[in-house]
């Protein structure tokens, strides 16, 4: 606010609380905290605040002060006005609605005008039960002059309305500025939501979910349906969000509406109604920025209140039609062959896309994080041991699971955890609208870039080795391709599922899977060779190698490059194989392979199975112990790797995992490289 706007009679906002700070002072308000620096600023503000009542002009406040102190007062008042902490004139709000006016004064320069707009708004309340009744009272007491309560399901004979009337247009007042829906059933809320959206009327939902009440606004950019679908991604027991063929809004509401809320007592009902009423006030008056894409959760037993942000969900009535879809869906060309111009545009955009800034990944990824409504619930160290490696975990939604990342620093570990989380989520985020009639999506042959249909069950498989999220498209595809090569190399050489536990018995026991040396000839790489490869790989690999030496881990590295001739090394501890890594060069496998060995040892020594690596087929005991040390395999180009796969009947296809456009916008390079066996 310009200085001249408050020079008349400055008044400090009623929600401002002054507290000292080591470097000056803080003013804590409903809108956040404002900081003022300076050795004496807290003393100045403390002395000045009692006089900023809106009754005295700046000239009157400074008339008896020396010029230097008068100038300081004017500068402080100007700073307060510029930050919206001081209003121009008038006493603090008072009267029967001083609470509402006081709240609005925190967000509006003219709280009275905002409150008048609120009073003039028509509000319809849909629902029955104790919470609906209490909320109706709260809204009337807050100053709303036009609140109508609709009790669906009571029947016309009792003066009510029949189920389904809202969707028929008989219930919804087209003049309403807001509909408030109170229910225990998300399916009922969805029916109300869609009816209101069709009529262009915003709706505030209060939906009970177990021992919680979730409240949020839907309309315009905001979508309660999106928020609820995000919530359901964390709660496998959440009620399905699908309305019946003939929505019976009243039946669900009248039957048990808010009985659960009432069971927690009258005080809980009162708090829940007050919360919903406050959000109505904030929405109608635009008192708070950022209510879009948020839901507020009231935990009914404890009355703890938290606000959660969500990204728009791709499966909702508000989701836009995808720009790129597989032809062969309804209205397309049968056969599931992708539209060539659209496919070419899509692939070109991925290839030409800017790499994700690693330093900015923390800020960009924050939009995906929320404990209840996020794509990722948390990224943290969870009390894991942080030596020798830093280990971070990310919780992933839809369905809930845990992924981890490790590295030499906490930031590096978190980056890898976020990438793993995005890959895992993207591999389960399937939009039915983007499948063709046969349930397929579009992939791209790595051999020639030609689009091919891929079964959705194959493309969206979070356990597949080729599921990767990277910082750029080329890197993600390459990582997915090489992970498939490692799986093929180890898997194709696997003999029986397990070794017999008892000599002379042909029944396989539950022991580890062993590789058949007839198909794979492990060649031992001595420490000197490993050191040379690590030096070629870079500082990270060398650091891992030094850690293994300090910990006296009996590292074993074998060249297991098979018929594909893609450099593949097996990394282990003694006779135990920990993992297989393929690369374009043998040196390219060292960083991931040595990190896997360290992670295995850290998990084992600290008894922390969360980040333990999955079992892999085992090399035979003392593999490659004879014949001397081997030279590392020859390097290959990516084109040679693809050609080798095709020559052996393995056709690699890259499928972009981009069905959630919000996640794709933040981290666009998630892919599953699948192998089509011809």
Feature roles, as predicted:
Residues 162-165, 175-274, 285, 301:
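E1/E1-like adenylate-forming module used to activate ubiquitin-like modifiers
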Residues 287-504, 514-678:
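Helix-biased "structured C-terminal domain" signature
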Residues 140-176:
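A short, well-structured beta->alpha microelement
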Residues 1-33:
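Long, low-complexity, charged/polar intrinsically disordered regions in eukaryotic proteins
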Residues 31-147, 523, 531:
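Long, charge-rich, low-complexity alpha-helical segments
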Residues 125-134, 151-154, 180-186, 206-209:
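Structural motif
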Residues 52, 81, 269, 273-289, ...:
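Short, hydrophobic alpha-helical segments
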Residues 61, 139, 196, 277-280, ...:
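Hydrophobic structural packing positions in well-ordered secondary structure
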């Amino acid at each position: 606010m310009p200085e001249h706007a408050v020079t008349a009679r400055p008044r400090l906002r009623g929600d401002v609380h002054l507290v000292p700070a080591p470097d000056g002072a803080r003013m804590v308000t409903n809108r956040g905290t404002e900081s003022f620096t300076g050795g004496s600023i807290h003393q100045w503000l403390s002395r000045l605040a009692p006089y900023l009542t809106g009754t005295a002009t700046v000239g009157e406040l400074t008339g008896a002060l020396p010029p230097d102190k008068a100038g300081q007062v004017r500068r402080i008042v100007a700073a307060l006005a510029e930050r919206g902490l001081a209003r121009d004139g008038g006493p603090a709000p008072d009267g029967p609605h001083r609470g509402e006016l006081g709240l609005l004064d925190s967000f509006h320069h003219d709280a009275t005008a905002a409150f008048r707009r609120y009073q003039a708004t028509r509000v319809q309340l849909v629902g029955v039960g104790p919470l609906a009744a209490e909320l109706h009272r709260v809204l009337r007491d807050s100053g709303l002059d036009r609140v109508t309560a609709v009790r669906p399901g009571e029947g016309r004979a009792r003066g009510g309305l029949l189920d389904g009337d809202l969707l028929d247009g008989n219930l919804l007042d087209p003049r309403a500025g807001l509909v408030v829906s109170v229910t225990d059933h998300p399916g009922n809320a969805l029916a109300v939501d869609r009816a209101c959206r069709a009529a262009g009327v915003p709706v505030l939902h209060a939906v009970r979910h177990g021992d919680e009440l979730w409240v949020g606004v839907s309309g315009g950019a905001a979508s309660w349906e999106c928020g609820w679908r995000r919530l359901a991604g964390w709660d496998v027991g959440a009620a399905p969000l699908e309305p019946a063929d003939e929505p019976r809004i009243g039946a669900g509401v009248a039957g048990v509406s808010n009985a659960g809320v009432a069971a927690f007592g009258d005080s809980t009902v009162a708090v829940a109604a007050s919360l919903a009423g406050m959000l109505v006030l904030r929405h109608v008056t635009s008192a708070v920025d950022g209510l879009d894409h948020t839901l507020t959760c009231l935990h009914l037993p404890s009355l703890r209140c938290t606000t959660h942000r969500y990204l728009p969900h791709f499966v909702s009535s508000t989701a836009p039609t995808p720009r790129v879809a597989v032809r062969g869906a309804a209205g397309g060309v049968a056969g599931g062959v992708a539209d060539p111009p659209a496919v070419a545009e899509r692939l070109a955009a991925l290839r030409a896309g800017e790499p994700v800034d690693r330093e900015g990944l923390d800020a960009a990824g924050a939009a995906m994080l929320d404990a209840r409504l996020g794509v990722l619930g948390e990224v943290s160290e969870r009390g894991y041991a942080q030596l020798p490696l830093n280990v971070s975990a990310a919780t992933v939604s839809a369905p809930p699971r845990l992924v981890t990342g490790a590295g030499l620093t906490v930031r590096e570990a978190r980056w890898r955890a976020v990438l793993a989380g995005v890959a895992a989520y993207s591999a389960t985020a399937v939009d039915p609208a983007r499948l063709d009639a046969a349930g397929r999506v579009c992939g791209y042959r790595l051999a020639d870039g030609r689009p091919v249909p891929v079964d959705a069950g194959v493309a969206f498989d979070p356990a597949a080795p080729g599921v990767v999220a990277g910082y750029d498209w080329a890197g993600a595809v390459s990582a997915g391709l090489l992970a498939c090569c490692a799986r093929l190399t180890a898997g194709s050489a696997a003999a029986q599922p397990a070794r017999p536990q008892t000599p002379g018995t042909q029944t396989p026991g539950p022991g580890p899977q062993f590789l058949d040396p007839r198909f794979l000839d492990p060649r031992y790489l001595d420490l000197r060779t490993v050191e040379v490869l690590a030096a070629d790989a870079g500082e990270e690999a060398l650091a891992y190698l030094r850690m293994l030496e300090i910990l006296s881990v009996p590292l074993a590295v074998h060249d297991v490059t098979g018929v594909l001739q893609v450099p593949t090394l097996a990394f282990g501890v003694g006779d135990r194989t920990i993992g297989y890594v393929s690369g374009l060069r043998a040196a390219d496998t060292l960083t991931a392979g040595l990190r896997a060995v360290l992670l295995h040892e850290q998990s084992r020594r600290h008894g922390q199975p969360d980040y333990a690596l999955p079992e892999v087929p085992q090399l035979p005991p003392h593999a490659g112990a004879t014949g001397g040390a081997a030279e590392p395999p020859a390097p290959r180009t990516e084109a040679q790797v693809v050609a080798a796969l095709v020559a052996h009947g393995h056709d690699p296809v890259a499928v972009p995992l981009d069905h959630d456009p919000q996640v794709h916008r933040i981290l666009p390079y998630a892919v599953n490289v699948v192998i089509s066996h011809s």
